């Protein structure tokens, strides 16, 4: 008997419910008809000082059990593993059933019991169902006769041609379904993918992601410089080397659209070959590794850039025609911008000044220029090719002037080596007036795989460390060098822990009274072991 709340749809209430005793029939009336009855009932009960529960209890007591024929003990069925539940005497359930209750588990499984009862008339015996939680499988606890037995037998016979069972329905978590487009465009290279990724990641995160990231300290150049380093270390090597950070930043947004789709072949350069190449180059010019520290990495950078870029341009012949002297001249140009005052004098220096001017102009131009293609054509070459070509085109006299420049530059280096403090100051000044010069150097360095190393050395140069001192790689020490380190190597381990062991001597040192012969001890131990074995056998 259910008491129905006002807002319940009467049709939602199940006709029968599987509960403890078996299947219970549910009697309910629509609320409207019953309202008066309920009111009268409650009123009466209030007057009597009773509650609904009391009524239920009394009715329960007054209902006699339906007479049950004594069950004849039939031989135990092997199939039933679940103990049949002891059925309590039928009770009158006084429950309230309204929309808050509507989804209750035991009520909502009334569909199952309904379709069972639909099989209908041929079933003589009332079926007792187990609550679902006790019912292992469909067949496990089923106590039903006849048709279920037939089903069982059929299932047993059918078990050979078992259909591949569908895996149990699992609760699905909605994962994003990967979409595969069929029109795979040109596959992005690793660099391009990284570039695309970089363009979407915020600058702070990027800083955290790029290992060994260290900006070059420099007052004048601030944010633009930082951003350009970011883009570089993100590997924007395809951005034209001549461009200044200004428009390289402009490009960084659309970098992920690979501009140079016909990518030219670049030799793969790993660190070893890179260092070797740098050694070969710095050695003949006679400027050791110190240049790199002195000049804030600039001269060495331009050279290193040359090395890589000229492999890259395929203009190797034309570049090396100038030989070391040519590169030296370029380094000198770099320096000439730092200390342009002392180098303006004299007819030979005149031409060099022209080259330097040319460089400075180009840099400024590039800063203004917008068209990336045009940047790529002149930008990449302008520092390198044009300076060099101008020098080479003028007359053979150039060679002489270059050589003198070279020497003068080395002289300057030597002076600087003697006074590292001065060099620090120099560098500071150079960086202060760095505007274009630093940018030019940056751009030359854009493609160099040595970015990080160059930056380290540059930073050293800035702080004014001694020129010879270069960033050393820290040596890892072997942690435990104790003599026992390899002892495991020679020890015989027992392969099987379970095999009986030979008896071992007691660990503690025997006290003075006990200090007996080792032989005696051993004999005792052996006797004990044997006794143990005998006991085991017994």
From Swiss-Prot:
Motif (PxLPxI/L motif): 500-506
Positions of modified residues (Phosphoserine): 142, 146, 261
Region of interest (Disordered), ranges: 58-128, 213-473
TM ranges: none
One cellular-component annotation, GO: nucleoplasm
Compartments (UniProt record): Cytoplasm; Cytoplasm, Cytoskeleton, Microtubule organizing center, Centrosome
InterPro entries reported in the protein's UniProt record: Coiled-coil_p8
Coiled coil: 349-366, 514-535
Compositionally biased residues, Basic and acidic residues: 301-313, 357-373, 381-392, 405-419
GO process terms (BP): microtubule cytoskeleton organization; regulation of mitotic nuclear division
Expression across tissues: Widely expressed with low levels in spleen, skeletal muscle, small intestine, kidney and liver.
Keywords: Coiled coil, Cytoplasm, Cytoskeleton, Dwarfism, Phosphoprotein
Comp. bias (Low complexity): 321-332, 428-438, 458-469
Subunit record text: Component of the 3M complex, composed of core components CUL7, CCDC8 and OBSL1. Interacts (via PxLPxI/L motif) with ANKRA2 (via ankyrin repeats); may link the 3M complex to histone deacetylases including HDAC4 and HDAC5.
Comment text on domains: The PxLPxI/L motif mediates interaction with ankyrin repeats of ANKRA2.
Protein name per UniProt: Coiled-coil domain-containing protein 8
Species annotation: Homo sapiens
Gene that this polypeptide is encoded by: CCDC8
């Amino acid at each position: 008997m259910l008491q129905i709340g006002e807002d319940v749809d009467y049709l939602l209430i199940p006709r029968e419910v599987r509960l403890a005793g078996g299947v219970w029939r549910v009697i309910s009336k629509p609320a409207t008809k019953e309202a008066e009855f309920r009111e009268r009932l409650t009123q009466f009960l209030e007057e009597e000082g009773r509650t609904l529960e009391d009524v239920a209890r009394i009715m329960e007591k007054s209902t006699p059990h339906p007479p049950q024929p004594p069950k004849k003990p039939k031989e135990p069925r092997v199939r039933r593993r679940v103990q049949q539940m002891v059925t309590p005497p039928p009770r009158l359930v006084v429950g309230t059933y309204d929309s808050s209750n509507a989804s209750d588990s035991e009520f909502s499984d009334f569909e199952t019991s309904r379709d069972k009862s639909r099989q209908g008339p041929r079933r003589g015996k009332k079926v007792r169902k187990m609550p679902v939680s006790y019912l292992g499988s469909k067949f496990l606890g089923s106590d039903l006769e006849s048709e279920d037995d037939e089903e069982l037998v059929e299932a047993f016979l059918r078990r050979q041609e078992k259909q591949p069972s569908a895996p149990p329905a699992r609760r699905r978590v909605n994962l994003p379904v990967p979409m595969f487009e069929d029109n795979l465009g040109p596959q992005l290279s690793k660099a391009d993918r990284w570039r695309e990724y970089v363009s979407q990641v915020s600058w702070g995160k990027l800083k955290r992601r790029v290992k060994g990231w260290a900006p070059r300290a420099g007052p004048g150049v601030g944010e633009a410089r930082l951003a350009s380093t970011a883009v570089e270390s993100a590997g924007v090597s395809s951005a034209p080397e001549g461009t200044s950070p200004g428009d390289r930043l402009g490009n960084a947004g659309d970098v992920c659209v690979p501009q140079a789709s016909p990518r030219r072949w670049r030799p793969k350069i790993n660190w070893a070959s890179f260092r070797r190449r740098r050694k070969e180059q710095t050695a003949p010019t006679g400027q050791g590794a110190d240049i790199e520290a002195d000049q804030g990495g600039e001269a060495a950078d331009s050279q290193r850039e040359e090395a890589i870029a000229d492999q890259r341009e395929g203009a190797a012949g034309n570049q090396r025609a100038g030989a070391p002297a040519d590169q030296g001249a370029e380094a000198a140009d770099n320096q000439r911008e730092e200390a342009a005052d002392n180098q303006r004098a004299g007819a030979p220096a005149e031409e060099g000044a022209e080259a330097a001017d040319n460089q400075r102009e180009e840099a400024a131009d590039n800063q203004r220029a917008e068209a990336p293609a045009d940047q790529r054509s002149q930008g990449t070459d302008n520092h390198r090719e044009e300076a060099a070509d101008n020098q080479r085109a003028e007359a053979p006299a150039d060679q002489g002037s270059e050589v003198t420049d070279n020497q003068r530059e080395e002289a300057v280096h030597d002076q600087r080596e003697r006074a590292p403090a001065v060099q620090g100051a120099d560098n500071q000044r150079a960086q202060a007036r760095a505007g274009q010069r630093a940018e030019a150097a940056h751009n030359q360095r854009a493609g160099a795989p040595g970015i990080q190393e160059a930056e380290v050395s540059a930073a050293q140069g800035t702080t004014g460390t001694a020129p010879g001192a270069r960033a050393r790689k820290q040596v890892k020490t072997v942690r435990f060098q104790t003599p026992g380190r390899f002892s495991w190597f020679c020890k015989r381990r027992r392969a099987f822990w379970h095999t009986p062991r030979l008896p071992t001597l007691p660990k503690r040192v025997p006290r003075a009274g006990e200090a007996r012969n080792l032989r005696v001890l051993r004999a005792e131990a052996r006797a004990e072991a044997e006794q143990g074995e005998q006991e085991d056998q017994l």
